[in-house]
Amino acid sequence: MSDRTGIFAGDDPFAIARDWLAEAERSEPNDANAIALATVDASGLPNVRMVLLKEIEPAAFVFYTNYESAKAIELEQAGKAAFVMHWKSLRRQLRVRGTITREEGPQADDYYASRSLKSRLGAWASRQSRPLSSRAALMAEVAKITAAKGPNPPRPPFWGGFRLTPVEIEFWADGAFRLHDRFVWRRNSAGESWVIQRLNP
């Protein structure tokens, strides 16, 4: 008999992740949807940075970025990534590992259109991860793009989403005296059934 009750109840890890995120959005002071996204470069050297998770789909996690950024290049070279979400207010953590594919269709268009005008223009102006001579140069590029693109800029061809389809999802909750609760969902590839295990703290 499973002892996965309360916040761990249920067999669908995406449903549990959505529930945890919804709870975190009520208690975290800001950016409850922030993830620390880990990638590796061509030499195998790891990189990590904060990114905002924008959707938990029925079978994947979606975020958006500049396709010319260091993270995007590393994502596409490796085809794999991992992230962690940590909520201090809940004393909980979610870890995810899996494969990466682009999302550059209507879903990406819709998300881009939902952003503020300044954020949409900023996506055009920023050549993410490339050297920048000064902030003044960046703001000059924003002004140039604003004049050229107007009030309804289309999604840049170099900007869009990535979908992480997991092969491992781990839920962690703080316990007294470091006796934490950890449950992991694992499978070898997307489409396979999950194997669920409790882990030692």
Curated annotation (Swiss-Prot):
UniProt-listed SUPFAM superfamilies: FMN-binding split barrel (SSF50475)
Family designation: Belongs to the pyridoxamine 5'-phosphate oxidase family.
Subunit field text: Homodimer.
Binding of substrate, residues: 54, 111, 115, 119, 178-180
Protein name as annotated: Pyridoxine/pyridoxamine 5'-phosphate oxidase
GO term, biological process aspect, one: pyridoxine biosynthetic process
Annotated FMN binding sites: 49-54, 64-65, 71, 93, 128-129, 172, 182
Cofactor dependency: FMN
Cofactor binding note from Swiss-Prot or TrEMBL: Binds 1 FMN per subunit.
Role summary: Catalyzes the oxidation of either pyridoxine 5'-phosphate (PNP) or pyridoxamine 5'-phosphate (PMP) into pyridoxal 5'-phosphate (PLP).
Enzyme Commission no: 1.4.3.5
Taxonomic source organism: Ruegeria pomeroyi (strain ATCC 700808 / DSM 15171 / DSS-3)
InterPro entries documented for this protein: Pyridox_Oxase, Pyridox_Oxase_CS, Pyridox_Oxase_N, Pyridoxamine_oxidase_dimer_C, Split_barrel_FMN-bd
Enzyme class name: oxidoreductase
GO MF term list: FMN binding; pyridoxamine phosphate oxidase activity
Catalytic activity: pyridoxamine 5'-phosphate + O2 + H2O = pyridoxal 5'-phosphate + H2O2 + NH4(+); pyridoxine 5'-phosphate + O2 = pyridoxal 5'-phosphate + H2O2
One Pfam family named in its UniProt record: PNPOx_N
Pathway where this protein functions: Cofactor metabolism; pyridoxal 5'-phosphate salvage; pyridoxal 5'-phosphate from pyridoxamine 5'-phosphate: step 1/1; Cofactor metabolism; pyridoxal 5'-phosphate salvage; pyridoxal 5'-phosphate from pyridoxine 5'-phosphate: step 1/1
Keyword field: Flavoprotein, FMN, Oxidoreductase, Pyridoxine biosynthesis
